[in-house]
C-alpha cells in the first residue's frame, strides 16, 4: 500500500493515472514485493513508527544491463538504489535520510564502490535530496511508465 501510494508522488505532472496504475500493478504489488524479498541480490529497508510504515528503500546488488546506465557507471561493483520513498507526512523529516544511510551502508558492506539511481529529470525535489547525500549526475537513461518513455538522470556516489 505504501509503495502504491508514494510512487505517484515522484512521477512527472504529465503522467496519466492509467500509466501510473499500470506501473504499480506490474512492479509494486504485494506479489512483486514477495519476489523482491526472496531475491538474494535485493535488500529492502522499511521505516515505521509504532503503527504504520513511513517509507522504504530497495537496493539491487547487481550490475545493470541497460547500456545507457552502464555508460554512466565506473567499472567495478555497483549497487542500484532502486526505490526510496516516504509517505507525504514524513517529507522533510528524518525518515528519508535514515533510509538513505541504511542504503549507503548496505551497499558499502556488500562491496559496492558505487551506489547509483535513476531519477526523473523533472523531479527536482528528489534530485536535491540525492545531491544532499553526495550523488551527482553521471548520465541519462529512459524509464518506461505505462505506454510512455520518461527521461531520467543517472546519479552516482
Where are these regions (language model features)?
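Acetyl-CoA-dependent GNAT
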Residues: 1-13, 18-93, 97-106, 110, ...
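C-terminal "cap" of GNAT-fold acetyltransferases
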Residues: 45, 73-79, 113-116, 120-127, ...
Amino acid at each position: 500500500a505504501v509503495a502504491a501510494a508514494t510512487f505517484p508522488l515522484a512521477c512527472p505532472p504529465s503522467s496519466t493515472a492509467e500509466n501510473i496504475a499500470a506501473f504499480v500493478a506490474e512492479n509494486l504489488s504485494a506479489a512483486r514485493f514477495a519476489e523482491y524479498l526472496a531475491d538474494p541480490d535485493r535488500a529492502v529497508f522499511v521505516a515505521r513508527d509504532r503503527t504504520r510504515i513511513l517509507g522504504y528503500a530497495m537496493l539491487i546488488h547487481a550490475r545493470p544491463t541497460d547500456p545507457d546506465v552502464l555508460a554512466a557507471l565506473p567499472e567495478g561493483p555497483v549497487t542500484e538504489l532502486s526505490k526510496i520513498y516516504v509517505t507525504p507526512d514524513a517529507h522533510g523529516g528524518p525518515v528519508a535520510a535514515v533510509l538513505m544511510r541504511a542504503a549507503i551502508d548496505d551497499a558499502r558492506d556488500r562491496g559496492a564502490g558505487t551506489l547509483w539511481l535513476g531519477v526523473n529529470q523533472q523531479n527536482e525535489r528528489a534530485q536535491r535530496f540525492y545531491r544532499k547525500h553526495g550523488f551527482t549526475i553521471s548520465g541519462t537513461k529512459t524509464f518506461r511508465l505505462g505506454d510512455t518513455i520518461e527521461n531520467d538522470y543517472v546519479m552516482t556516489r
